[in-house]
Amino acid sequence: MKLSRILGVVCLLFSSLCSRAATPPTVTIFVDATSAPRKIFHAKLKIPASAGDLTLYYPKWIPGEHAPDGPVVDLAGLKFSAGGKTLKWRRDLLDGFTIHVDVPAGENEVNAELDFLSPATFEGGFSAGSSATDKMAVISWNQVLLYPKGWKADDFTYVASLKLPANWKYGTPLPIASTSGESGETQITFKPASLTTLVDSPVITGEYLKVVKLADDPPTEMDIAADSAAALAAPPEVWDHYKNLVEQANKLFGAHHYRDYHFLLSLSDHVAHFGLEHHESDDSRVDERGLVDETARKAEASLLPHEYVHSWNGKYRRPADLATPDYQQPMQDDLLWVYEGLTNYLGTVLTARSGLLTFEQSRDDLAITAAMMDHIPGRTWRSLQDTADAAPQLYFAPQAWYSWRRGVDFYDEDTLNWLWVDVIIRQQSKGQKTIDDFCHLFHGPPSTGPILKTYTFDDVVNALNQIVPYDWRGFWTERLTNHGPGAPLGGIEGSGWKLVYDDNPSEMERGAAGNFHVVDGAYSIGLELREDGSITDTIEGMPAAVAGIGPGMKLIAVNGRQYSPEVLHDALKAGKDGNTPLELLVENTDYYKTYKLDYHGGERYPHLVRDESKPDLLTEIYKAK
């Protein structure tokens, strides 16, 4: 054989080996959720491998959670085998989400077994939170899988199957290949999907599960699991409002970027409460009576609109530094003022346009947001931009000292900022353009499946300038970096309204206090507390803080009488325009002390009132299209 021929054969063999080595693996995963009522999920995986060190990852940075909070602490029962023999493994000393497995020669597949321990009590946040009860569960695939090093999440193919408890139904956006089962137990085999799609497609399941069709083109539905059948019996107008939500959202954006969409809604007092976006679904969780109780329903009215908007803003359009290739590479949260802030604003708009809240309720809700942000003294040292930059820490910060530390204010403060943007667009264009035009340009046509298109700060500025030429870079730089004083109220004032305070709480204020079991003295004496008197925050510079009261203390008595919410309210009213100090007996780490507050302003609650000197743009913004 000639040398050239030999070299050619060698090159061909080398090329073939490299090609095989570079082929992304297909992983099979079986999840047994039949023990969900015990708060434990069992998983088995088959992972292609070769001799030597197999590096496996447990997902760390979960899209939408904006932090390295993958619930690795609840990964248990980890075992690996190949060829019928148990394999040794060790956790990486520099990264607890990385596992190294020693694969012997001659083996090309590793079997993995693991358990996920869902928190047994109401605790945790996002996919690390409580996710199962006796009657229902939510399976987030990132909880129950591993993936090998070396490829992007888009490159993997996962063939997944799931076994459910007897007589439990389910809902998911993940395409299904087949179902089977015996003795009431259901086993679902899903169509092969990329790891990206799998992690982005949770499953809701339960004994009491209701499916409500919202739209046909594309198919859109609510899959609602509850701890009781009674919790699913919402009045018919509720479903009408959610149908309106789908219609109004598609009008707002002018297109969609999903094949079908599933609102996955958990109704339980025993799972973690939050909303987490996915491209073709959302994982939202509220109180068991969150649909049937009118007060609870209003308190959480904007949750599903917010998560639905994320299908466009956050999933289809995403900051470039949040679009990482896998779940280990750190994400950068600096553009959360768009990802979450714009979403929050559009969510409030759609809440009003769909009828989930009336105009008056939406207006009162906006007043509460403005007042909250206007009582954040922490803005004097921490910019709005830093609340985004520090999001991985702030998401898990305690409630105590919130107003001085600041929290993830890019939600509420940017609701005000994006309202301001909407108002500027309307003013500069003499009513010819609105934020809807920006949404059409930035998030809109043509309709597609679940694809990703990234953006930068410059892209946002350029898109805004295409709608209305303006110093948008200067506007956002100022809004993100300034230190007050006070909240950005330009949007409210420019829309023809003013923030004022009086002694009558609005319907939304009363509802929030009752639903979340809090007493709000933030705008009077700067005191926030629970119904039992536990003080969650005091606002620096306001009477309670000036007197020496701080978070973690407990209010025992008011003006010599045992504390109750009503006693505090009555004392604030009685002290208005008087001369006698308000006396608060407070317990602090087993010690008692009476604090005297020189306050005589009565109760103060926020409202918006019309400024008749300006056009009423807010009513137009909230009007259904």
What is each stretch, according to the model?
Residues 34, 46-48, 63, 68-77, ...:
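Non-catalytic architectural context of zinc metalloproteases
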Residues 17-21:
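Sec/Tat signal peptide C-region and signal peptidase I cleavage site
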Residues 210-336, 342:
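Juxtacatalytic substrate-recognition/specificity segment
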Residues 7-16:
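Bacterial N-terminal signal peptides
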Residues 1-7:
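Bacterial N-terminal signal peptides that target proteins for export
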Residues 282-291, 316-317, 328-381, 585:
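Post-HExxH zinc-binding segment in Zn-dependent metallohydrolases
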Residues 22-61, 142-143:
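Early extracytoplasmic/domain-onset interaction patches
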Residues 347, 357-625:
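C-terminal recognition in membrane/secretory proteostasis and scaffolding
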